[in-house]
Amino acid sequence: MRVLLLGSGGREHAFAWKIAQSSMLEALFIAPGNAGTRLHGKNIQLDPLDFQAVKSFVLENNINMVLVGPEEPLVKGIQDFFLSDTELKNVPLIGPDKIGAQLEGSKDFAKKFMFRHNIPTAKYATFTKDTLVNGYSFLEAMK
């Protein structure tokens, strides 16, 4: 199996370490990777947010599976991009679609989801720089 792992953090290092142990692995590419990931596969200069570049790499290198580590490509819709592309839709990409990724990528979205579905969670409110005074009041009320 030929695997492309997107990301450059500690999470991706752990993924690379474990994937490299598989007897099914033919090649592991990590984009962009880090000093630790290079011990387990080949780091490549590829921006995980450049979906067209990811597509080209997947097709040119006969990638069988893509694993997305960081939230940002998922929140920006890389899974949706793969599923809507006729050349990529049969290449498994591990990670949620854009809407599902919002649960991790947006705390405001996640909290609203939890309240809407009666999932126990701590009290919260969302503030901006324009409503900072309201934020201070909210925090004072939490004491």
Task: Identify the residue ranges that each predicted region occupies.
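ATP-binding N-terminal substructure of ATP-dependent carboxylate-amine bond-forming enzymes
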Residues: 1-99, 109
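Short, small-residue-enriched loops and turns at beta-alpha junctions
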Residues: 100-104
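Active-site nucleotide/adenylate-binding loops and adjacent lid/helix of ATP-dependent enzymes
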Residues: 4-5, 90, 105-143
